[in-house]
Amino acid sequence: MKHVKNFENKKVLVLGLARSGEAAARLLAKLGAIVTVNDGKPFDENPSAQALLEEGIKVICGSHPLELLDEAFAYMVKNPGIPYTNPMVVRALEKNIPVITEVELAYLISEAPIIGITGSNGKTTTTTMIADVLNHAGQSARLSGNIGFPASEVAQPVTEKDILVMELSSFQLMGTESFHPHMAVITNLMPTHIDYHGSFENYIEAKWNIQKNMTKEDFLVLNFNQDLAKDLANQTQAKIIPFSTKEKVDGAYLDGQMLCFKGQAIMSASELGVPGSHNVENALATIAVAKLSGVSNEAIRETLIHFGGVKHRLQSLGNIAGVKFYNDSKSTNILATQKALSGFDNSKVILIAGGLDRGNEFDELVPDIKGLKKMIILGESAPRLKHAAVQAGVTYLNAKDVAQATRIAFQEASPGDVVLLSPANASWDMYKNFEVRGDEFITTFKSLKGE
């Protein structure tokens, strides 16, 4: 790694732990910083803080005392999930203390070039696709960032022979100053995380940070299905490589059923290992990055044919007696479930849906569920989903949890059918998170397969 001098003998406050904060604290100590960690969780319930203290790093836990900022900190490294309205962050900015995220640290020390991927939907799938394609082609791609591997940790051992493929959230990008990927992708831009950013305009501004240090030597891959992306394309120094499923563009595009790049047919959309129109978009973004990285058409096709998806994101589990199972537990809203259903023939789909009741009516889901073979409904939102099923003319059955729903769905299925867990709701009424919900689906699938 690059041994940058930016933090040497400087006081740095790491605000918020979790994996990224813990990794940042260790890295800063390696770089010679005088590190203080502040986390809201009490010390005796905080194994990360305990481990850092044993390593000689100062930790203050249980609250966020504003007087802590009376010290002359040169930087604050903020956990991405902590909003800028947090009193500690507000006070730091008032004192002109630079507030950064650990992604900025990763960039400063990385010897490897960076491919950054952001967007409202499809980030994780596209990031994983890109890394898989590059690795299949014999390159050395390392996943990092919002995908679960702290960027500042992954960046330490890499060399110029590696490539950091980094998933980036708007929260992370807000805390960047010099961050400069040589290639970047914005999958799409939808009005999300408005509670954090305050407005859609602020959210776009945070996402747009991905390109702010890019030059004409760099490449920015944008989704030209969106007029917003076309407008933004005029506001960057980077070379634009568009992708689209609606028109032929000077980049990656869908021509009939063929996925193409600048006139070359790469593969048929029907060959993709994951279904859904959104995954065609993800694949096109991947193709653009792969071709810019010198990957052969054959290597791209081989990878995308066998790509089984990312865990809990329209993940293909396999089949039992000709019935296919897909785990899309990450679909915590209506739009995500609509996209999941777009990849299937409704007459063969048994949909498992329901979860936390946020007061949503499901009227906009009605056109998408028409013609479903059946629905298995569970959770707090069950009454509202049942109403939507009746409107759509779909037969539904009740289940107490995902395990029971999966068994009922399999009993109702015939060879050639699809059992799809795509809840259209958050999980917190019954499960700690969508991962636990999805894991229950996977466990039940494995149990059924073994019976």
Swiss-Prot record:
Residues binding ATP, per UniProt: G119, S120, N121, G122, K123, T124, T125
Pathway(s) the chain acts in: Cell wall biogenesis; peptidoglycan biosynthesis
Subcellular location as annotated: Cytoplasm
Reaction catalyzed: UDP-N-acetyl-alpha-D-muramoyl-L-alanine + D-glutamate + ATP = UDP-N-acetyl-alpha-D-muramoyl-L-alanyl-D-glutamate + ADP + phosphate + H(+)
InterPro entries for this protein: Mur-like_cat_sf, Mur_ligase_C, Mur_ligase_C_dom_sf, Mur_ligase_cen, MurD
Primary localization class, coarse: cytoplasm
SUPFAM superfamilies: MurCD N-terminal domain, MurD-like peptide ligases, catalytic domain, MurD-like peptide ligases, peptide-binding domain
GO molecular function: ATP binding; UDP-N-acetylmuramoylalanine-D-glutamate ligase activity
RNA-binding recorded as keyword: no
Keywords: ATP-binding, Cell cycle, Cell division, Cell shape, Cell wall biogenesis/degradation, Cytoplasm, Ligase, Nucleotide-binding, Peptidoglycan synthesis
GO CC annotation: cytoplasm
Function per UniProt: Cell wall formation. Catalyzes the addition of glutamate to the nucleotide precursor UDP-N-acetylmuramoyl-L-alanine (UMA).
Protein's name in the database: UDP-N-acetylmuramoylalanine--D-glutamate ligase
